[in-house]
Amino acid sequence: MVVKKIALFGATGNTGLTTLAQAVQAGYEVTVLVRDPSRLPSEGPQPAHVVVGDVRQPADVDKTVAGQDAVIVLLGTRNDLSPTTVMSEGAQNIVAAMKAHGVDKVVACTSAFLLWDPSKVPPRLQDVTDDHIRMHKVLQQSGLKYVAVMPPHIGDHPLTGAYTVTLDGRGPSRVISKHDLGHFMLHCLTTDKYDGHTTYPSHVYE
């Protein structure tokens, strides 16, 4: 099936904003769920539909997923490193809504820390990483076509489209531009070769 309509969760984060812009420019009809619509860009590419709500509210998620062909998940906690369940709760609601509406493809971003020895995760990032782990398990057990994107450090470098994607392990670099990360998330909608895999996009920038 050709994906034309997508739900984007986490659209107002750094990677979310560039993914939204690239998706609209690529011709996708994008629906976003946001708590604060004022965080969406006032100029440039705009989502086709904006649902104001919270990913922890099943009804808000259901409204966002209905009628879509695929889902992109870029949920995060910004700079809040305290214990959280927002990503795993959100993933549970997203999976339930996808099953209810017959949507079977999801591309979800967590973190490269899931590829590390757990004892090497920096203590200050442990709580967020724990919720990423819970979120990943929700996807693994969903029965859906899921792509788990586990990026290294996310930088501000320009879009290259020339990044390396390593399956089920870590790659040649410890950085990926937010623009290249968004590009890869969208690329995953056009192929099934990453379905069921963990993917590590990275690039050696100039």
UniProtKB/Swiss-Prot annotation:
Coiled coil: none annotated. NADP(+) binds at residues 10, 12-15, 35, 38-39, 54-55, 75-76, 78, 87, 109, 132, 153-154. It comes from the Eukaryota. It catalyses: reduced riboflavin + NADP(+) = riboflavin + NADPH + 2 H(+); bilirubin IXbeta + NADP(+) = biliverdin IXbeta + NADPH + H(+); FMNH2 + NAD(+) = FMN + NADH + 2 H(+); FMNH2 + NADP(+) = FMN + NADPH + 2 H(+). The modification Phosphoserine is found at S42, S82. Pfam families: NAD_binding_10. The active site is at C109, C188. CDD domains: BVR-B_like_SDR_a (cd05244). Enzyme that can both act as a NAD(P)H-dependent reductase and a S-nitroso-CoA-dependent nitrosyltransferase. Promotes fetal heme degradation during development. Also expressed in adult tissues, where it acts as a regulator of hematopoiesis, intermediary metabolism (glutaminolysis, glycolysis, TCA cycle and pentose phosphate pathway) and insulin signaling. Has a broad specificity oxidoreductase activity by catalyzing the NAD(P)H-dependent reduction of a variety of flavins, such as riboflavin, FAD or FMN, biliverdins, methemoglobin and PQQ (pyrroloquinoline quinone). This is Flavin reductase (NADPH). The gene is BLVRB.
